[in-house]
Every structure is written in structure tokens, then in C-alpha cells.
Amino acid sequence: MEEADRILIHSLRQAGTAVPPDVQTLRAFTTELVVEAVVRCLRVINPAVGSGLSPLLPLAMSARFRLAMSLAQACMDLGYPLELGYQNFLYPSEPDLRDLLLFLAERLPTDASEDADQPAGDSAILLRAIGSQIRDQLALPWVPPHLRTPKLQHLQGSALQKPFHASRLVVPELSSRGEPREFQASPLLLPVPTQVPQPVGRVASLLEHHALQLCQQTGRDRPGDEDWVHRTSRLPPQEDTRAQRQRLQKQLTEHLRQSWGLLGAPIQARDLGELLQAWGAGAKTGAPKGSRFTHSEKFTFHLEPQAQATQVSDVPATSRRPEQVTWAAQEQELESLREQLEGVNRSIEEVEADMKTLGVSFVQAESECRHSKLSTAEREQALRLKSRAVELLPDGTANLAKLQLVVENSAQRVIHLAGQWEKHRVPLLAEYRHLRKLQDCRELESSRRLAEIQELHQSVRAAAEEARRKEEVYKQLMSELETLPRDVSRLAYTQRILEIVGNIRKQKEEITKILSDTKELQKEINSLSGKLDRTFAVTDELVFKDAKKDDAVRKAYKYLAALHENCSQLIQTIEDTGTIMREVRDLEEQIETELGKKTLSNLEKIREDYRALRQENAGLLGRVREA
């Protein structure tokens, strides 16, 4: 057992347990060393469970009992077959400790128990855990973010990205320079924000449309590209998008190259009113007569023709001004445009408030109109009834008799219809009950089959999950096998195992030989006992016949009887001696077993722990009294 203990201690050292060099057997293990060995093994086997356990034995007795119970529960969760409690850790015995450590050593991973080149300790465990995580991530194939499952998103990560979804925008185009843009659009054309229902796609659609307009403008400015827009508009949507993208890439490169030149003449600012009209062209385009808001907008933002001519004539002069004057003019123009935009926004807010007020008034008027129509219809119905009654008043008696006759006919007709309905209702009710019963049976059968199908689906899912888990374990084991060094020599362990097996075989042969010799000896004893009994019986019979005639024969008979009695006592004494020797050997084995369990030392430890526990309780009671 010492050789087995040394192999087990070597495995514990590989798992990270700091076993002193002078400890060669499990009999020398202390309580602190037992707790540390079990915790280190649990951390290697299941880091999630072992990370919450401390390898150091606490000083307080209550904390010791809690730690021992936690270790026992963790080992039982791993599948330890024998009974386990706190006493197995605080007061360990050699056989129980050997069984427990062998159980844990068998469940140690391969790299923790056989790879002797790896360092031991917490850092080694951390490095091995990091390596296993990296191997798992490298073993998984790369998947695009939109196709990742939640597990892959957890492993590989997935940022919250929004795809670029652009929609085709329909805006009015200028067919002639002199005609305003709002009169060229269709009355049914919606505003640009309304054409894109998703808020996420509005910015993308505007960017794409702006880039397309820029590319079209650049294409118009270049000679030979005037019909490019008409050519792309006649293409299918996919080819149109592809052609626009290629055209855009070429034109943007040239546009950016030209934009980084020297600052030239500032581009003439577009009329803000025209810009707002182009933005909201779909709202009111078919009105031949402008509203008050339109007139105020034109009055506020429309430039005078003379000012426009002056601005156009001043463009060459402005281009010759210094750069600072140009920037100042641009800033001033930008400030004026901002002020105009704020005024327009305020006007829009006022108009929206008026529209909301008018909308509320319109809803109230509609509700009042509906109520008036309902009350009018009710009054008309009552008026018709009263007018009919007034018409019947001149000949009241005859009309009353006619009405009575009509009522009686109606009652008879109702009774007749009730009888007919009863005739039809009885078979229909019976058929309904029959069909309801069949429906209930079908529902029960359907529910039963549905339950069977659900159970079958669950079993299929469980089998698929189990197969997937086993496949992952197989791949992990194969990857670990590939990473293991090929030059690991197990010759010493194999040779030692073969020697142990040979010794066991020799011991078995010796035990078999001893058992066979014992059986032969038992047979010989039995045969000699039977032969002795038969010889004594014959001799007793012969001597007893002659004992009546001769005194010497009588004395010989007495001596024979005494000899037989003494031999019987001697045999009984020998048997008792053998029984006692067997009991002595059993007691010696029990003594060795009890000595191996360290009963006396455990009792002494229990007494010390009991005294420490009483001291702790006394201290706690003193604190309670003081509080």
C-alpha cells in the first residue's frame, strides 16, 4: 500500500496540493492536509464548485464544520458512492481517506494528473483554464454577426450594429428653370420623411439620395454624360443600384480631389423659402392660390431681383477679396439664414398649434353632428308611429277589432311555429349531442396524440442535445490529445503496475495452496478420527468380552477407556486452541484497523474541539450578556 500511497500523493502534488516531502503515506496526513488536498482536487475537477471553497482550515469550530459539510456535499455531488460526513475530513481514517482520494484522483483531468512538466498551484490552474477557453474559441468556426446564435454571441461577441437599409426617395425635379419646384410635383407626392416609415432608414435614404444627386450633377457638368440619368433610370433596380454605385465611386474621387483646391467664389445661397417648399412639396402643391403662411414666407424670404442681380455681379469682386473678408461675409450670411430659419420655425409652430385647435374643434363638431342625426332619426320614428295612430283614431272600434284579430292570428302562428320548431329541435339536439360526444372523443384522442408527439419531440431534443454534448466532448478530447506531448514515458508506472500484478498473482497462488493444504489436512484429520473411532469400538468390544474373566484384561480395559477420554480431551483442547488463535488473529486485525483509523488521536481531537467549542459558546454568551 505504500507504493500506491506514493503514486496517489504524486497525483495530489500534480493537482496543486503542497504535500511535504517527508509525508510518504496517507497515515501521515493531517486534517489541514486532507482539506487542502480535497479542495485542490475539486478545483481541478470542477472549478465552479472548488473556487468557492477555501483550502485553509479556519480556526473557528463552526467554520470548520461548515467547510467540512460543504466538502462532503461537493464530493457526494460528484458521485461518491460511500457515506460521507464532516468527520471524514476533521477526523480522517486511513481506509476512508484512501477511498476518497482515489475517487477524486480518478476524476482528475489528464493534463492535471499525468503531465509532469506543468507547474502546480493556483497559477497553473488559472493558466489551464485560460488555455481551455482559448482552445474552445479557436475550435469554433467564425460566423457572421447576423447569423450567430446567443451562445456564439456570448463567445465571439456581437456589437449592436444597425444595417444600412436605404429606400428609393421620390422628389420633384426641375424640368424648367423658370417654373417653381412645388408646381412640378404631383399632388399625391408624400414628403420625404413620410416616404420612409422606419426612422432608422431615413438617414441612410437621405445620404444615398444626396450622393446620387451629387453624382448626377457632376455627370451633367461633364461633357458626354448628359444622358447618364436617363440611362440609369431605365435599368432594373439591381442593375440601377450597381451602376449608380460604380458611377458614384468614380465621381466622388474626382469631386473630393477638386474640393481640396483653393477657395474660389462662394456659391450663391439658395432661397430658404424655395428650399422649404422643396422639402414639403407634397403637402399642398395643387392649390392655385397661396395661403397666408405662403405669402408671409415669400414676403420674408424671397430676395429682391435687384439684390440678386447685385449679388451675381459682385461674385467676381468677392472672389478677389481677401480670405478674411470672404469668411466674414459667409458668417454674416449664415447668421441671417439662421435668423430666417428660426422665424420660419416659429411660424410653423404657430400654424401647428392653430391646426391642433381647429382639429379638436372639428372633432367636437363631428360628434355633435352624429348625436343630432341620431336624435333626429329617433324623433322621426316616433313621429311616424304617432301619425299612424292618429290615422287609425276615426274608426277606432273596427280598427281595434282588426288589431285583436291580427294579434290572435299572430299568437296562433307563433304556437304553430313553436310546434314545428320543437319537431325539428329534438332530432337536431340529439344529433348535436352525438356530434359533441364524437368531438370530445376526438379532442381526447388529439390531446393524447399531442402529448405523445410532445414527449417524442422532447426525447428527440434530449437525444440531439446529448449527441451534441458528446460530440463537443469528443472534439475537446481530440484537441487535448493532439496538444499532449508524444514523448511522455509511462514505462516506470507500467513496470510498477506489472510488478504489483505479479505480486498479487503470487499471493493468490500462495493463498490457493494454503487452502488446498488445509483441505487435505482436514480430510486426513477426518479419516484418522473415523479410523480411531472404529479401532476403539472394535478394541472396546474385544476387551470388554474378556474383562469379565481376567483381572488384567479388566485393568487394560480401564486404561483403554482412560486413554480414549484423554485423547478426546486433547483433541478438544487442540480445536479450542485453534479457535482461540483464529480469534486472536481477528482481534489483531481489528486492532490494526482501529490503529489505522487513529481512534485515540481522533478522540483526543474531538475532546480538544469540544473544549474549543465550549470556549467559543462561552465567549458568545458573554457578548450577548454585554449587549
From Swiss-Prot:
Subunit structure: Component of the commander complex consisting of the CCC subcomplex and the retriever subcomplex. Component of the CCC (COMMD/CCDC22/CCDC93) subcomplex consisting of COMMD1, COMMD2, COMMD3, COMMD4, COMMD5, COMMD6, COMMD7, COMMD8, COMMD9, COMMD10, CCDC22 and CCDC93. Forms a coiled-coil heterodimer with CCDC22; this heterodimer interacts with the guanine nucleotide exchange factor DENND10; the interaction is direct. Interacts with CUL1, CUL2, CUL3, SKP1, BTRC. Interacts with SNX17 and SNX31. Interacts with CPNE1 and CPNE4.
Tissues where the protein occurs: Widely expressed in adult tissues and in fetal liver and brain, with highest levels in prostate and lowest in skeletal muscle.
The organism's place on the tree of life at top rank: Eukaryota
Region (Sufficicient and required for interaction with CCDC93): 1-447
Name of this chain's protein: Coiled-coil domain-containing protein 22
Effect ascribed to mutating residue 17 to A: In RTSC2; may affect splicing and/or have a negative impact on transcription efficiency; results in decreased interaction with COMMD1
Organism ancestry: Eukaryota, Metazoa, Chordata, Craniata, Vertebrata
PANTHER family per record: COILED-COIL DOMAIN-CONTAINING PROTEIN 22 (PTHR15668:SF4), JM1 PROTEIN (PTHR15668)
Compartments, record wording: Endosome; Cytoplasm, Cytoskeleton, Microtubule organizing center, Centrosome
UniProt modified residues of type Phosphoserine: 410
Family: Belongs to the CCDC22 family.
InterPro entries attached to this UniProt entry: CCDC22, CCDC22_CC, CCDC22_N
